[in-house]
Amino acid sequence: MTKDLNTLVSELPEIYQTIFGHPEWDGDAARDCNQRLDLITEQYDNLSRALGRPLNVLDLGCAQGFFSLSLASKGATIVGIDFQQENINVCRALAEENPDFAAEFRVGRIEEVIAALEEGEFDLAIGLSVFHHIVHLHGIDEVKRLLSRLADVTQAVILELAVKEEPLYWGVSQPDDPRELIEQCAFYRLIGEFDTHLSPVPRPMYLVSNHRVLINDFNQPFQHWQNQPYAGAGLAHKRSRRYFFGEDYVCKFFYYDMPHGILTAEESQRNKHELHNEIKFLTQPPAGFDAPAVLAHGENAQSGWLVMEKLPGRLLSDMLAAGEEIDREKILGSLLRSLAALEKQGFWHDDVRPWNVMVDARQHARLIDFGSIVTTPQDCSWPTNLVQSFFVFVNELFAENKSWNGFWRSAPVHPFNLPQPWSNWLYAVWQEPVERWNFALLLALFEKKAKLPSAEQQRGATEQWIIAQETVLLELQSRGRNESAGSEALRGQIHTLEQQMAQLQSAQDAFVEKAQQPVEVSHELTWLGENMEQLAALLQTAQAHAQADVQPELPPETAELLQRLEAANREIHHLSNENQQLRQEIEKIHRSRSWRMTKGYRYLGLQIHLLRQYGFVQRCKHFIKRVLRFVFSFMRKHPQVKHTAVNGLHKLGLYQPAYRLYRRMNPLPHSQYQADAQILSQTELQVMHPELLPPEVYEIYLKLTKNK
């Protein structure tokens, strides 16, 4: 079997992974797999413990099967997929060496395997440094679809994703941020970053799921999730916050950094600050405040999370939107008691809104969004006075007019439109000096509101003027927001077109340069041809939207946007025609007989150019490196020749210089997770070659072994 395995390994295009159970090939592996294995094993153990059994694992792009067989040794049932027969041959030979393992290996294409998967067939899927090839072949959208399906039919997916910055042929096909491939999935979390043998650019590793919250100390299924804090929140926080709801828990997952750089530094800091604030408050709640228990929390460079006990009930905002009957007396009473208790301890909630109040079956209200609990008595928005803001909240609770859509709040500040005795209560507060306003006063007057004098009978001209003015202001705000919606939509479409224009201009510049010094048709030209119809459709949509939404008398800003839209249309057609002509010219050149006849001349010219650019010495070094790479590759494929050469170098005393040269040309990968493994590798090297020990230790070693 050893001879057969040697032959199979020598036939590999590349020894990419560590060969399971055969340390003699560790030095030949392109990547050290042990650091990634530690993380993968940790996630396997967490999921296995949560499900209460060994897992069924799918390894996509299994290469030489190191990760598959390592998990099989823990009791997992493995199916490994790779499109190269040579890799599968090695995997099967290694599986035969370990007959107790439940491991099966097949030749196949990842796209076809994912399409044929059934839900529940596998618990865990692994895809390490493989999907960038599919992106290059089929595009970003297709890979997003594949990964969505993979997350749908498994409990968890572990992905190592290549990045655009890597200097390789497929780099230009990759998304600007690898998270673009998985952002459509419910849950994803960065768990590590690793260098590769191809470049010093690290590749991120993500844990992905459409079914579970996967945190090291918390692994539970969720019933549903949303990227809005409440219904109707729109683009609040730019969808950088995700909320997962389990049977008895709620998980808040805040991203500090998002694809496309959509979060500003201030927005990122706000996410981080509010999460830290909520964790701090809930782990040390003030005495007498009924806070949910914290189940787990943590963060990394990209995100932070908090898992807490799920409170019973529904959001007050949802109940109001549905027109349900609510007991305002109980809701306001319980809410005021909570706010007064917080105030007594030196805390205030700066965002008391219907969507931050949970109401249970007994109509008892409880505050949520504990990240908004602060030590400064000031609201997070207009009006900044907390008592005034609470006036607006009470008006929202009684509001019959749902049509207002204000810039900040959509209900009045004054209490004069409220029914009795609620108007009497807030008017009594209104009459107090502002410096006396607090929640203790609100609660005290609330409890005796039935005995307070009528607000309507005390109303004067000033109050009547306030009612009239605030009604007009709210109406104007609503109209302003509605009328600006069309312009906002146009502005977004103009921005998209300008981005497409910039890409077209870059493509044109590249084509002009390539027409002067012809080479093969680039991917930009292909991209242009494939996307012209999409650009034209987008432009027509923008024009239709403009005609439908903009009134005959256009505001100057909207008219300017339409002019820019028309200019963009003309520029796109102009660039399209020029690029089509360039493409035809390049194709004519490549089909010509002279192009084929001058292939050797062009190669010779390239070598002369490189010689002039780098000099004779550098070109000689380059030639020597190519020869040495061929020799090293030949020896890796022929272990017996390698063994003979190593013995000969030892006898001649040249092994260490040769080994250093080999390592210089084939460096081991390094990453922030490799420190322990590097120390271990150095120790093993010293055991094998005592002359590498420190001089004092080596002298003691010689004394101990000289009589043996």
Swiss-Prot record:
Membrane topology: Peripheral membrane protein
Known catalytic reactions: 3-O-phospho-alpha-D-Man-(1->2)-alpha-D-Man-(1->2)-[alpha-D-Man-(1->3)-alpha-D-Man-(1->3)-alpha-D-Man-(1->2)-alpha-D-Man-(1->2)](n)-alpha-D-Man-(1->3)-alpha-D-Man-(1->3)-alpha-D-Man-(1->3)-alpha-D-GlcNAc-di-trans,octa-cis-undecaprenyl diphosphate + S-adenosyl-L-methionine = 3-O-methylphospho-alpha-D-Man-(1->2)-alpha-D-Man-(1->2)-[alpha-D-Man-(1->3)-alpha-D-Man-(1->3)-alpha-D-Man-(1->2)-alpha-D-Man-(1->2)](n)-alpha-D-Man-(1->3)-alpha-D-Man-(1->3)-alpha-D-Man-(1->3)-alpha-D-GlcNAc-di-trans,octa-cis-undecaprenyl diphosphate + S-adenosyl-L-homocysteine; alpha-D-Man-(1->2)-alpha-D-Man-(1->2)-[alpha-D-Man-(1->3)-alpha-D-Man-(1->3)-alpha-D-Man-(1->2)-alpha-D-Man-(1->2)](n)-alpha-D-Man-(1->3)-alpha-D-Man-(1->3)-alpha-D-Man-(1->3)-alpha-D-GlcNAc-di-trans,octa-cis-undecaprenyl diphosphate + ATP = 3-O-phospho-alpha-D-Man-(1->2)-alpha-D-Man-(1->2)-[alpha-D-Man-(1->3)-alpha-D-Man-(1->3)-alpha-D-Man-(1->2)-alpha-D-Man-(1->2)](n)-alpha-D-Man-(1->3)-alpha-D-Man-(1->3)-alpha-D-Man-(1->3)-alpha-D-GlcNAc-di-trans,octa-cis-undecaprenyl diphosphate + ADP + H(+)
Binding-site positions, ATP: 229, 237, 241-243, 252, 274, 309-311, 358, 369
Pfam families listed in its UniProt record: Methyltransf_31, Pkinase
Region described as Required for localizing WbdA to the membrane: spans on this chain: 687-708
Pathway annotation from the record: Bacterial outer membrane biogenesis; LPS O-antigen biosynthesis
Stretches the record annotates as Methyltransferase: 1-210
A GO term for molecular function: methyltransferase activity
Cellular location(s): Cell inner membrane
UniProt-annotated stretches for the region Kinase: 211-459
The keyword Isomerase belongs to this UniProt entry's keyword annotation: no
Enzyme Commission code: 2.1.1.294, 2.7.1.181
InterPro entries: Kinase-like_dom_sf (IPR011009), Methyltranfer_dom (IPR025714), Prot_kinase_dom (IPR000719), SAM-dependent_MTases_sf (IPR029063)
Main enzyme class: transferase
Coiled-coil zones: 485-594
GO BP terms, alphabetized: methylation; O antigen biosynthetic process
UniProt: S-adenosyl-L-methionine binding residues: 16-17, 36, 61, 82-87, 108-111, 128
Keywords linked to the UniProt accession: ATP-binding, Cell inner membrane, Cell membrane, Coiled coil, Kinase, Lipopolysaccharide biosynthesis, Membrane, Methyltransferase, Nucleotide-binding, S-adenosyl-L-methionine, Transferase
Role of this protein: Regulates the length of the LPS O-antigen polysaccharide chain. Stops the polymerization of the chain by phosphorylating and then methylating the phosphate on the terminal sugar. This terminal modification is essential for export of the O-antigen across the inner membrane. WbdD is also required for correct localization of the WbdA mannosyltransferase.
Similarity-based family: Belongs to the WbdD family.
The protein's assembly and partners: Interacts with WbdA.
PANTHER family: METHYLTRANSFERASE (PTHR43464), UBIQUINONE BIOSYNTHESIS O-METHYLTRANSFERASE, MITOCHONDRIAL (PTHR43464:SF19)
Annotated protein name in UniProt: O-antigen chain terminator bifunctional methyltransferase/kinase WbdD
Lineage, opening ranks: Bacteria, Pseudomonadati, Pseudomonadota, Gammaproteobacteria, Enterobacterales
Gene name of this polypeptide: wbdD
